Amino acid sequence: MPRALWTAWVWAVIILSTEGASDQASSLSCDPTGVCDGHSRSLNSIPSGLTAGVKSLDLSNNDITYVGNRDLQRCVNLKTLRLGANEIHTVEEDSFFHLRNLEYLDLSYNRLSNLSSSWFRSLYVLKFLNLLGNLYKTLGETSLFSHLPNLRTLKVGNSNSFTEIHEKDFTGLTFLEELEISAQNLQIYVPKSLKSIQNISHLILHLKQPILLVDILVDIVSSLDCFELRDTNLHTFHFSEASISEMSTSVKKLIFRNVQFTDESFVEVVKLFNYVSGILEVEFDDCTHDGIGDFRALSLDRIRHLGNVETLTIRKLHIPQFFLFHDLSSIYPLTGRVKRVTIENSKVFLVPCLLSQHLKSLEYLDLSENLMSEETLKNSACKDAWPFLQTLVLRQNRLKSLEKTGELLLTLENLNNLDISKNNFLSMPETCQWPGKMKQLNLSSTRIHSLTQCLPQTLEILDVSNNNLDSFSLILPQLKELYISRNKLKTLPDASFLPVLSVMRISRNIINTFSKEQLDSFQQLKTLEAGGNNFICSCDFLSFTQGQQALGRVLVDWPDDYRCDSPSHVRGQRVQDARLSLSECHRAAVVSAACCALFLLLLLTGVLCHRFHGLWYMKMMWAWLQAKRKPRKAPRRDICYDAFVSYSERDSYWVENLMVQELEHFNPPFKLCLHKRDFIPGKWIIDNIIDSIEKSHKTIFVLSENFVKSEWCKYELDFSHFRLFDENNDAAILILLEPIDKKAIPQRFCKLRKIMNTKTYLEWPVDETQQEGFWLNLRAAIRS
């Protein structure tokens, strides 16, 4: 018994382990190219069953705590491994040993307290390594990255425990495109620790305090292209001129992101610009200036310029004491060499005239997302302001009058590119004044409803997208590029108004079609973007778009953005894939063919009706319908005649002199209905026939060659035949007055022919001795 329990327990463990492995393997989704996605699946270990077919593995944002030597040993072709945002605290020495093709490794935001160089000793082709956000204090006891000659992006450090950088830490690295060091609590920086890296394209340094900043700058200033400082309080920053003044520098760009300045520390930064002579571009992003802008007592007057800085960018500048801020007149002299200035989303409402006049080299000015209005723009664009300015961006400010804006900018004689988009102009006056060299104008998202001659005739590029325009009828002889997407245009502009247009973007309007002739009329058009419209996929439109192989070279968004809106059965389909039926595309031909077919059908029907007596059948149907309105059989008391006699006029002698004598003078006499004497004069013949038949007990047909040929007999039979033989009774008595060929009976009397073939009829005997028997049989038939 104990042995049986032990066996059952072992099998249960095996089954549960297998199910667990199967569940983990199923939590991965892999595509045919070997890209496996397992992020955010609540995994607590690396799934088993991974093979050499896996080339990219994403296990980020899980609960993995451990990476073992065998977890990834079969993934020999793995190129990308993402293990970020887990709970990994242990990585065995040979965990990545078999990943010789690995190019991207992310171990960020785990719980690694120690780093080992043995992890990376076989990763010769590794290009990207992210170790941010772990718990380590240093980068290990030995050189961590000496086996990574192809590494181009490296991210190390954390915001709390990483406190030391030593000289050995970056040994073996000669060139990095990007190096990010998160060292908010850095306490020890050994000089020359970063100097071993011969070239760094972009260094991102997170520091809380600037105590060690100058020491780091000394090591990198000769090997760095772009230096980015983040999350730093520079209130106590002091720049030592002696530390850098005698060194050659390669830094071309400085970026300050989420950095705090005071008036004093800002002056120290300006000194840095002056001494690091290679700096061409400076950017302040989401920074805070804790001062009032009073630099007069801070020896700023001894600095004549901002070094070689040509581009200055300021985004989201916060000034807590904004309403106490000085006029910045002390920094005006420093701006003479600056060529490009961007001050975005920083509550700028005025550029003082004097500052504008000092910006003598300025070619590009971007004041987007600020508070500029026509009143303040008048002061900013004063006489002699920005004398070489070519591009002015006033996007999303508080401008309201297009006419006044153009007039205020007349002082800018060299202005050729103006962006005043996202201002609420609403309307456009008939005439405006603009600087004489204007070539580019951006009026997108300004809520204008129509375009007028206000626009300068010198324009080469015009952007009026995202407005309420329903037409474009301006003559702009020099316009080369037109951006008019997201409006309400129903058709392409007239090409004669835009003779040199080469680029047109007119997507997301309400255009429903365009033709080859329209496109050909734009003789210089090279690029057209017209997707996102409600196209009517007519036969002509589909024939044009699907038949032009070169159309894709002109339509940049072809074919995915071109969808049918109608007809309904192709709605939503790509224009390239839509198909219409023959009847939709050749309606005239189909209608003509249908008319011809109908004519032939009518002609054939007429021939058949004539051949098979169709008119007779219709007349019979009409007579029958009329008769149907009356009782199918007259009440017994309405029977007035013993028999109705249908006969040919040429057989009247036999009927009137023999039959009448034998029947009406018999005792008791029979009462016969003869059309000559008993039809009511003036009554419609149809009613006479129908009434006579209905009031007669029997109907006697006197058949002969004359009967078959007689038009009168045919006429009687035309209107009596249907009712007599539709009732399936024995009311008809056939008398064959003379032998006739059954084939001579018309085909339309099919039931009469059938009766003659299936029922007995009376034949008039030539022998007088047999005639008495004939009359006896006839009287008996009438009485039956």
Curated annotation (Swiss-Prot):
Coiled coil: none annotated. InterPro entries: Cys-rich_flank_reg_C, Leu-rich_rpt, Leu-rich_rpt_typical-subtyp, LRR_dom_sf, TIR_dom, Toll-like_receptor, Toll_tir_struct_dom_sf. Disulfide bonds join 30-36, 353-382, 432-454. GO terms for biological process: cellular response to diacyl bacterial lipopeptide; cellular response to triacyl bacterial lipopeptide; inflammatory response; innate immune response; toll-like receptor signaling pathway. It is a single-pass type I membrane protein. Keywords: Cytoplasmic vesicle, Disulfide bond, Glycoprotein, Immunity, Inflammatory response, Innate immunity, Isopeptide bond, Leucine-rich repeat, Membrane, NAD, Receptor, Repeat, Signal, Transmembrane, Transmembrane helix, Ubl conjugation. The record marks 349 as: Interaction with bacterial lipopeptide. There is a cross-link at residue 754 (Glycyl lysine isopeptide (Lys-Gly) (interchain with G-Cter in ubiquitin)). GO terms for molecular function: NAD+ nucleosidase activity, cyclic ADP-ribose generating; signaling receptor activity; transmembrane signaling receptor activity; triacyl lipopeptide binding. SUPFAM superfamilies: L domain-like, RNI-like, Toll/Interleukin receptor TIR domain. Residues 525-579 form the LRRCT domain. Residues 21-587 are extracellular. Residues 639-782 form the TIR domain. It holds the Pfam family LRR_8. GO terms for cellular component: Golgi apparatus; membrane raft; phagocytic vesicle membrane; plasma membrane; receptor complex. Residues 1-20 form the signal peptide. It is found in: Membrane; Cytoplasmic vesicle, Phagosome membrane; Membrane raft. Interacts with LY96, TLR1 and TLR6 (via extracellular domain). TLR2 seems to exist in heterodimers with either TLR1 or TLR6 before stimulation by the ligand. The heterodimers form bigger oligomers in response to their corresponding ligands as well as further heterotypic associations with other receptors such as CD14 and/or CD36. Binds MYD88 (via TIR domain). Interacts with TICAM1. Interacts with CNPY3. Interacts with ATG16L1. Interacts with PPP1R11. Interacts with TICAM2. Interacts with TIRAP. Cooperates with LY96 to mediate the innate immune response to bacterial lipoproteins and other microbial cell wall components. Cooperates with TLR1 or TLR6 to mediate the innate immune response to bacterial lipoproteins or lipopeptides. Acts via MYD88 and TRAF6, leading to NF-kappa-B activation, cytokine secretion and the inflammatory response. May also promote apoptosis in response to lipoproteins. Belongs to the Toll-like receptor family. This is Toll-like receptor 2. The gene is TLR2.
